[in-house]
């Protein structure tokens, strides 16, 4: 509010550096800066309004920002819903396979309707995992989302996603440490957007994981148009490859597309849906320096190799089932 000789003016900055009106976020534990102007003597109302407007300009420009709202691929996590009671075994196997650390396990409600789950975050050099072991039935549509993308501004991200053609399956809601929403891209690709009250600070990844998508020829172009508009992803390759890449052996070809953005990498397989098990069950591909050594660590810690590429493949890779039911692709990074 502005008055000629008396002004009380307040706003705060969230941890990502964005300015907000205090009235919108009075219950959040953000780092904030409150500016109070009271009993200002000798300053005209016109000058005071100009000064206040100058302070607000950054907030206006950020809100209008149409650039990518991504923070970085190390903040984008694969969502893993483990079989009930298998969280210990899963976390132990992932850490022994990839290295890294995990946060303290907590029992929380991470959905907008009543539910309870154990939740734990695993940070590895090859990618991050948000792990859930629900103690209650899982509310729909949770469990179908592939991953979570950290965004700098939730409201702006929702606007951008909708403008790009995404459906908002779960409108933004508060969780214990921020806000979340679930969106769906053309082709039925679900993902969660999240924003933290206190901005996290994770080390850069040694290898950025791939979001692996299987789409039909009827929907892939719609997905690309929509997802690229939101993520500002660049097409790194778009080519025909042998269908042995997806475990088939009929000497056919499939279209494979690779994207890269600040949200991370995406590898798209355009298929007729005739996929041998376990292809299509994996959501993420992880790059490692030494595939044989990594697979040895995985199997020693309770994982099972379900499929492995042949020597004729362009990229050495394997599909691995970890304790708790999670299936991942692991591949040798180029040297």
Positions of the model-derived regions?
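Bacterial N-terminal signal peptides that target proteins for export
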Residues: 38-52
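Bacterial N-terminal signal peptides
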Residues: 51-59
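Boundary at the C-terminal end of the N-terminal hydrophobic targeting segment
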Residues: 61-66
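Core segments of cupin and vicinal oxygen chelate
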Residues: 69-72, 79-126, 163, 171-185, ...
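Vicinal oxygen chelate
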Residues: 73-85, 120-122, 134-160, 179-184, ...
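A cross-kingdom feature marking solvent-exposed beta-strand/loop segments within repeated
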Residues: 105-118, 130-155, 162-179, 198-202, ...
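Short, structured interface segments
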Residues: 181-202
């Amino acid at each position: 509010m502005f008055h000629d000789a008396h002004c009380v003016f307040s706003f705060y900055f969230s941890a990502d550096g964005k300015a907000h009106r205090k009235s919108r976020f009075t219950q959040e534990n953000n780092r904030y800066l409150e500016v109070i102007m009271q009993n200002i003597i000798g300053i005209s109302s016109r000058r005071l309004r100009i000064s206040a407007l100058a302070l607000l300009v950054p907030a206006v420009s950020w809100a209008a920002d149409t650039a990518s709202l991504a923070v970085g691929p190390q903040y984008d996590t694969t969502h893993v819903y483990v079989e009930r009671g298998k969280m210990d075994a899963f976390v132990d196997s992932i850490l022994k396979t990839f290295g890294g650390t995990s946060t303290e396990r907590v029992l929380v409600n991470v959905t907008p309707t009543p539910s309870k789950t154990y939740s734990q975050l695993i940070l590895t050099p090859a990618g991050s995992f948000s792990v859930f072991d629900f103690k209650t039935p899982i509310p729909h549509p949770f469990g179908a989302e592939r991953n979570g993308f950290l965004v700098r501004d939730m409201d702006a991200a929702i606007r951008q996603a909708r403008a790009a053609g995404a459906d908002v399956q779960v409108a933004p809601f508060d969780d214990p440490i921020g806000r979340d929403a679930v969106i769906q891209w053309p082709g039925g690709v679900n993902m969660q957007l999240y924003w933290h009250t206190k901005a996290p600070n994770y080390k850069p990844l040694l290898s950025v994981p791939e979001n692996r998508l299987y789409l039909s020829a009827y929907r892939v172009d719609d997905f690309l148009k929509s997802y690229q508009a939101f993520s500002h992803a660049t097409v790194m390759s778009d080519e025909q490859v042998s269908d042995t890449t997806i475990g088939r052996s009929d000497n056919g070809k499939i279209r494979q597309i690779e994207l890269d953005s600040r949200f991370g990498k995406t590898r798209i397989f355009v298929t007729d849906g005739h996929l041998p098990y376990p292809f299509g069950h994996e959501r993420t591909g992880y790059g490692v320096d030494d595939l044989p050594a990594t697979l040895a660590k995985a199997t020693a810690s309770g994982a099972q190799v379900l499929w492995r590429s042949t020597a004729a493949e362009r990229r050495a890779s394997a599909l691995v089932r970890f304790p708790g039911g999670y299936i991942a692709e692991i591949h040798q990074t180029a040297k």
